[in-house]
Amino acid sequence: AAQAAAPAVALYYGKELPHTDFRAFDIVVIEPDHAPAAAAPALPDTRFYAYVSVTEVLPSRAYYRDIPDTWKLARNQDWQSEVIDQSQPEWPAFFAERVVAPLWQRGYRGFFLDTLDSYRLATTFDEQAQQQGLVRVIEALHQRFPGIQLIFNRGFELVPQLPGKVAMVAAESLYRSWNAKTQRYEEVPEQDRQWLLGQLRDIQQRDGLPVLVIDYVAPHDRALTRA
């Protein structure tokens, strides 16, 4: 398949959106709990996408208290979040109605889907059942919200199962990573980098989708940021 043209994308999870910094971007991914609206008059040509965690839920989210304990598969100790069992039959509808629908009502039409592989944090899990559950989640979103645009953060194995339902695939830490446990920026090992490059090439060449790479650099390290 021919590779689609890649839009310019920025990710910003801060509370104060510096509009002038984002005029060069087609898409800005933001934390919707920090932003009152899905559009900014100062940026008429920029689309705002909402960051949404799929398999992990923080206790601070409004819908957290309504998630049954039986749906909780594991805990991410680094971020203090609960990992949700994607094989639960009622989860796709819950995710669509409780997580995405309120954001859709606020005007968001694009979503950055994070934590698509966090089920692997569990001690035991059925890989196929978890992936099938995630496919049902994505299909539920397209059925419930016609025209929805989705950027995957990883989820490489899911993309071939969802033709026409993914707009772009992102991946963190091609060259540099952030270690939440040690609170340090680290260089990615060459073996991991080559594996990730292979995944991204497949997405571009096999699926014809644009890719987005997110690397982590200390804010004061301007030279490395520009490298």
Question: Where do the model's predicted regions map?
Answer:
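Glycan-processing catalytic domains of CAZymes
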Residues: 2-227
